[in-house]
Amino acid sequence: MLGATTATATTSTAAMTTLSATPNVPEDTTPLNQDIVESSKEPEQVASFTPGQCLFCPITSSTLEESMVHMQKAHGLFVPQQDHLTVDLETFFRYLHLVIFNYRECLHCGTSRSTVQAVQQHMTGKGHCKFDVSEDSEFAEFYDFYQTEDELSEGSLNEDGSSKDPDRKPLQVDQDSMRLPSGRLISKKSSAQAEPSLFQARRRLRTTVPQIESVPTGSDDEVDTSNEISTPDTQVLTRREKRQRATAAHQLANMSAGDRAALMHLSSSEQRSLITTNHKFTEKVKKEEARSQRRLDKKGNKNLYAYWNTENPVYPCG
């Protein structure tokens, strides 16, 4: 009995000695988020704009003109209506470079990719090395299609009578904005990973240039200012607003007398909004009717083909 007790005490002592001899493992004092910070990838460096650099491949030309010829022959990029551009070609291609290399978006459909090479491959593979200059496009801000013959004959005169400076160049307001010589501000929202739906929404919600009111000088400033507010004809309107007013007046003239009388109590802006909404709804109805008619014609052609197939004789005559 005494021997068993002695053996047990010896075993306990040996175990305590082993535990005390085990080296202490140092605690991990590294912050939990250090691995996350170290593993996070650095943002992709945006290449600076070079006039001779192709937007879709690594080929570099000596001048911008040679690069434009290469992009047109190799990739199909064409700049239409260059006479109506409000900026020089270098500034326009600088904005295209911003869209592709900074925001990694397709020029044609607005599809976003994670890298520049991916969006370049998308555009070359889909044939999207082009851009839209329609009214609802963001590239329409670089064009001015509404110059009248009088404005073209005046040459170097602005709307307010001041002389134009042909050497004026766009100003880079910040990394995402550019002010054109006409006073328009072209900006791109900082959404490098934006979805195509956000791109389409940005195109639809593109803001227009506010109206600029002329401020007369003289002793009767208050009287003239009140007259300008009451009469919109004295305001300096943009060409787009003039065109919208002319279109609304044309559509209003084509309405019946009853419809025009029903709109007389509304303001001019409300009339234009209502006419535009009605026009869009009419166009949508026409498209739906045409689509339904095509489906009906297609179904009729299938039934006619099946009918004549079954009417053929099973066995040849004779």
UniProtKB/Swiss-Prot annotation:
Residues 1-22 have a biased composition (Low complexity). Induction: Expression is positively regulated by the trichothecene cluster-specific transcription activator TRI10. Residues 1-32, 152-200 are annotated as: Disordered. One of its GO terms (cellular component) is preribosome, large subunit precursor. Residues 161-171 have a biased composition (Basic and acidic residues). Glycans are attached at N254. Part of the core gene cluster that mediates the biosynthesis of trichothecenes, a very large family of chemically related bicyclic sesquiterpene compounds acting as mycotoxins, including T2-toxin. The biosynthesis of trichothecenes begins with the cyclization of farnesyl diphosphate to trichodiene and is catalyzed by the trichodiene synthase TRI5. Trichodiene undergoes a series of oxygenations catalyzed by the cytochrome P450 monooxygenase TRI4. This is Core trichothecene cluster (CTC) protein 15. The lineage of its organism: Eukaryota, Fungi, Dikarya, Ascomycota, Pezizomycotina.
